[in-house]
């Protein structure tokens, strides 16, 4: 069964006066896929990605359907979406909510109500997997843009999502940090089997 099934999705922003940002988009995204959306600036890539998580969906008029595991996305609880659909934003600073690296790694798990033992295990596992143990106790404000984006990714992956959505995650990074980040995303897809949409 597909993670996402998008059927004839049309969307226009409230201020767009009838101009569609997305028009009759149909797409099936299967488990384990690595899907890259390409297009010019303003072509609707970010708008489409934000449709895949209801708390991030912009205001506007939408027609068509989006299904997650065969269920209309609008009927999937926010908690289930938080646990199963990870989303990394363009700007690393837009997603960080705590002051310490370790707390940022644990924040999503706390929000999901995970017990302490599970939280500690997942935080340690992600710190090791992403190679960020050396800055585990650092203030988030001292991190570079690339480190912050890697922390965002590790924090999302600590929740073990089935799908990882990334909205131009390297747009704020230098070329070396961007390359390293994308290699890490590919590793998540191949080693962990996480579906990636970027």
Outline where the language-model segments fall.
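A short, flexible loop at the N-terminus of ABC-type nucleotide-binding domains that lies
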Residues: 1-6, 11-24, 56-59, 77
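The feature captures the beta-strand-to-loop junction immediately N-terminal to the Walker
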Residues: 38-40
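Conserved ABC transporter NBD signature motif
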Residues: 61-72, 81
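Conserved ABC ATPase "signature" region
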Residues: 117-135
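Conserved ABC ATPase signature
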Residues: 139-143, 147
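Conserved catalytic motifs of ABC-family nucleotide-binding domains
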Residues: 160
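Catalytic Walker B motif of ABC-type/P-loop ATPase nucleotide-binding domains
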Residues: 164-167
């Amino acid at each position: 069964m597909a993670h996402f099934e998008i059927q004839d999705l049309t969307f226009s922003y409230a201020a767009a006066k009838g101009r569609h940002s997305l028009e009759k988009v149909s797409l099936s995204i299967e488990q384990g896929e690595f899907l890259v959306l390409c297009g010019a600036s303003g072509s609707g890539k970010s708008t489409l990605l934000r449709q895949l998580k209801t708390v991030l969906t912009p205001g506007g008029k939408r027609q068509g359907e989006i299904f997650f595991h065969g269920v209309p996305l609008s009927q999937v609880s926010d908690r289930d979406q938080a646990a199963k659909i990870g989303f990394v934003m363009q700007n690393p600073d837009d997603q960080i909510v705590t002051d310490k690296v370790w707390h940022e790694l644990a924040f999503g798990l706390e929000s999901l109500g995970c017990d302490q033992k599970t939280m500690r295990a997942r935080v340690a596992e992600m710190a090791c997997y992403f190679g960020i143990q050396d800055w585990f106790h650092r203030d988030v404000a001292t991190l570079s843009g690339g480190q912050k984006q890697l922390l965002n990714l590790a924090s999302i992956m600590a929740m073990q999502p089935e799908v990882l959505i990334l909205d131009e995650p390297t747009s704020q990074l230098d070329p070396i940090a961007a390359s390293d980040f994308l290699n890490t995303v590919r590793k998540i897809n191949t080693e962990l089997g996480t579906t990636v949409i970027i």
